UniProtKB/Swiss-Prot annotation:
Belongs to the tRNA nucleotidyltransferase/poly(A) polymerase family. Transmembrane segments: none annotated. It is an enzyme of class 2 (transferase). SUPFAM superfamilies: Nucleotidyltransferase, Poly A polymerase C-terminal region-like. Nucleotidyltransferase; part of the gene cluster that mediates the biosynthesis of the lipopeptide antibiotics leucinostatins that show extensive biological activities, including antimalarial, antiviral, antibacterial, antifungal, and antitumor activities, as well as phytotoxic. The function of lcsQ within the leucinostatins biosynthesis has not been identified yet. Its EC number is 2.7.7.-. Its main location: mitochondrion. InterPro entries: NT_sf, PolA_pol_head_dom. Keywords: Mitochondrion, RNA-binding, Transferase, Transit peptide. This is Nucleotidyltransferase lcsQ. GO terms for biological process: tRNA 3'-terminal CCA addition. GO terms for cellular component: mitochondrion. Induction: Expression is positively regulated by the leucinostatins biosynthesis cluster-specific transcription regulator lcsF.
């Protein structure tokens, strides 16, 4: 079952789906891709292939195995090679020996003088061998050997087949054939092999024609595939958004099946959910993949989670029965708004002012993801503990194991949302007190000190405000400048509405909404309080106490705030004596034990 979309969103989705089906048709002709049976190896890859084949011959000659060793490079490396994407990570699949055993024999072989000479092995070409123990909670179902050779990161593992229990995503593993190994994988495009002995690509599941069609499909029945391992649902979303592929409709129809959603909620560790979500929200397309503004990989990933009804299986506390679920009907406004804002990186734009660094952009996408939870309060009658996290931060911590730094920003965004919104509205209405530099600057310092990233707290408030004020977020309106994404307005925006008079009503509403927030941020910049949290104090607590002739105490923090407010009112002053005098005059209010 898919979401019922508004007519405007349905039209946009048809455009986007059509675009994703046809993107890259020039760089990778479907006919050529469907019949591609070889790949072009780099010099380092050719060197590695020759070495590995020599190791196979030495093992076969020793008679340690019952059948000849056959090596295949598997999965993502093959997919990326066929797409023209460079990859330095190679999974090596072995037919008749464990990965650990083969890797040890290979490392021993690389110490032989003849091998060193024949393959040009330098003193730093072979790294240390690391055996990674079986760890099902982290999707390591077999012991794996890892080593770096010729600058390439190799993982060695045997071909296998899997058997799943109903109540676990951790399979029983046995040696298997190449076809059985391919069938157990999450998608046909990840089930391709490059046979080192024949030099050909082996396709047991139809992965080559699926790549030609830019399609993601499961090798086996999708319901069984996802029930066995519900993490595959999230992996397919990630691959579709990163590679700009679309998900096969038959596969897509099963992704929100109640059995799959329940398995995703309770059968899979939340750490693994967090890993996949982090990869989605940090998602970038490879340089070879052309990305249209509509199809930003992170925005597209959230859109797929939305359309496939996966939200409540991810952003949830699986240990508790849900007592309240946020309204998702306008969630699309939040992530579409953020994608639109980040598409305009011109100086002074909202996206530039509120998310300056790569880390800030990642946090911003997390905030967009949890926007439906941001205004949710604890149910009435629930006894709150001191410093208890709000529901949005609890969901992030328990649902996808968000780190403390991230939950702190979410909690602060929740607590300061109304205050931020009130200040923004006051600025837009021209309230005289908003011209007071100390009031605005101290508010910003307080937000930043209680969770950090005050700019991202403002961005979170903006996204929630967008969900509440705007019915839809038009992605395409009118052409922008060549240097800007289509439909991104110039910044700063005029506060007047004349620009929007002849536009579609939804576009006019969007532009008016952005105008208000741009006006607020322009005001912050004009007051020169954007960097208020990093302003250096003219004196610290010890110096203030010494000037007052008392010991530091509980009063110190409030008194230092008085000094900082004075600094904000007097930005050109470098002598703190008048600030100290103001503290002295307010000693009773501040609780300072002075004699006179």
């Amino acid at each position: 079952m898919l979401l019922r979309l508004s007519p405007s969103r349905m039209a946009l989705k048809r455009k986007l789906d059509s675009f994703l089906r046809n993107v890259h048709s020039q760089s990778a002709p479907p006919a050529a891709m469907a019949h591609a049976r070889t790949v072009r190896l780099s010099a380092r890859e050719e060197q590695l292939r020759a070495l590995l084949l020599d190791v196979c011959r030495s093992i076969d000659a020793a008679g340690d195995v019952t059948q000849p060793i056959i090596l295949r490079w598997a999965g993502g490396w093959v997919r990326d090679k066929l797409l023209g994407i460079e990859s330095h990570d190679i999974d090596v699949a072995i037919n008749a020996m464990t990965g650990v055993h083969f890797a040890q024999r290979m490392c021993d072989f690389c110490t032989l003088p003849d091998a060193i000479k024949r393959h040009g092995i330098g003193p730093r070409d072979v790294g240390n061998l690391h055996n990674v123990a079986r760890n099902p909670d982290k999707s390591k179902h077999l012991e794996t050997a890892m080593v770096k050779i010729f600058g390439l990161d190799l993982d060695f593992v045997n071909l296998r087949r899997e058997t799943y229990a109903d109540d676990s995503r951790n399979p029983a593993m046995e040696f298997g054939s190449a076809e059985e190994d391919a069938l157990r994988r999450d998608a046909t495009i990840n089930a391709l092999f490059f046979n080192l002995h024949t030099g050909c690509v082996e396709d047991f599941t139809g992965g080559l024609p699926d790549m030609a069609a830019r399609m993601i499909r499961t090798p086996l029945d999708p319901l069984q595939t996802f029930t066995d391992d519900p993490l595959r649902v999230l992996r397919l979303v990630r691959f579709a958004s990163r590679l700009q592929f679309y998900i096969d409709p038959a596969t897509q129809r099963v992704m929100d099946h109640p059995t799959v959603l329940q398995a995703l909620r309770v059968k899979i560790s939340r750490e693994r959910v967090g890993v996949e979500l982090e990869k989605m929200l940090k998602g970038t397309c490879p340089p070879q993949v052309e990305v249209h503004f509509w199809a930003q990989p992170t925005r597209r990933a959230l859109e797929l989670l939305d359309e496939l009804h996966l939200y409540h299986a991810i952003f949830t506390d699986p240990a508790r029965e849900p007592t309240e679920r946020p309204d998702l009907r306008r969630w699309h406004v939040a992530y579409e708004c953020l994608g639109w804002l980040l598409g305009n990186r011109s100086p002074g734009s909202i996206g530039t002012l509120l998310a300056q660094s790569e880390e800030a952009v990642y946090v911003a996408w997390n905030l967009a993801a949890v926007s439906p939870w941001m205004p949710v309060e604890e149910p009435p009658g629930v006894k709150k503990k001191a410093n208890a996290l709000p529901p949005v931060a609890v969901i992030a911590r328990e649902g996808f194991r968000a780190p403390n730094k991230l939950t702190d920003v979410m909690a602060a965004s929740h607590r300061h949302r109304k205050e931020i919104l009130q200040l923004k509205e006051a600025v837009c209405h021209g309230e005289p007190w908003t011209r007071q530099r100390d009031r605005c600057g101290m508010a910003i310092r307080r937000w930043d000190s209680q969770g950090g990233f005050w700019t991202l707290q403002v961005l979170s408030t903006l996204l929630v405000d967008a969900m509440e004020q705007v019915d839809s977020w038009p992605i395409v309106a009118h052409p922008g400048k060549p240097s800007q994404p289509a439909d991104v307005p110039e910044t700063p925006l005029s506060s007047g509405a004349s620009k929007s008079k002849n536009l579609d009503p939804s576009i006019a509403k969007r532009d008016d909404f952005i105008t208000g927030w741009q006006k607020f941020l322009d005001h912050v910049v004009e007051l020169n309080v954007y960097n208020a949290p990093t302003m250096k104090r003219l004196l610290d607590g010890r110096a203030l106490a010494q000037a007052l002739g008392v010991k530091p105490g509980k009063w110190t923090g409030k008194a230092l705030d008085v000094c900082m407010a004075w600094q904000l009112r007097n930005p050109d002053e470098t002598d703190p004596s008048k600030a100290i005098e103001e503290v002295r005059m307010r000693r009773d209010e501040l609780g300072i034990p002075l004699d006179g």
